[in-house]
């Protein structure tokens, strides 16, 4: 009877240990993903490679849009303090009119009237309605081979409910 009781306790402890270990691993991956996302939104004028915008009333692109330092700080602050909701492909806007793409930490090359960009972080912001913005994040890793090649690390889509962010994008597109 004592042996049976000890065996049951060891089995119980083993199961509890496996569950706790699994939760620790799961929590670590979630915390790591959260920290990566929050770091993506921290930027300043110094690490912006280029800002691309698509005007909302016409299908024209501006590949060298400029924001003032205080506007960049305000945008970064809005993004850092926003709550992210995971988005699906069905949440994606049907067109990109009125969107803004911010390319961070990289370089840009212009040749023969074409523009090529190499960047570590890309944030595309497209208003969905007056209170929500579809956010497409792209994180790349440089190949360090003196080319413009990058290795894709992550692409994620989110929705941010923020009328301030919608207003900011509308003012700048």
What spans do the regions from the language model cover?
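Function-determining sites in protein domains
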Residues: 8-16, 21-173
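Short, Lys/Arg-rich N-terminal segment immediately upstream of the first membrane anchor
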Residues: 1-9
């Amino acid at each position: 009877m004592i042996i049976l009781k000890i065996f049951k306790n060891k089995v119980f402890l083993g199961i509890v240990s496996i569950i706790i270990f699994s939760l620790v691993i799961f929590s670590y991956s979630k915390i790591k993903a959260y920290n990566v996302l929050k770091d993506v939104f921290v930027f300043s004028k110094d690490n912006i490679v280029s800002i691309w915008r698509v005007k909302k009333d016409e299908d024209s692109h501006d590949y060298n849009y400029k924001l003032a330092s205080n506007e960049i700080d305000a945008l970064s602050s809005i993004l850092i303090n926003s709550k992210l909701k995971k988005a699906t492909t069905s949440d994606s806007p049907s067109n990109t009119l009125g969107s803004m793409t911010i390319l961070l930490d990289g370089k840009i090359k212009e040749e023969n009237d074409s523009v090529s960009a190499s960047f570590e972080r890309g944030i595309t912001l497209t208003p969905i309605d007056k209170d929500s913005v579809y956010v497409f994040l792209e994180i790349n890793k440089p190949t360090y081979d003196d080319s413009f090649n990058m290795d894709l690390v992550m692409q994620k889509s989110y929705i941010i409910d923020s009328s301030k962010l919608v207003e900011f994008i509308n003012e700048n597109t």
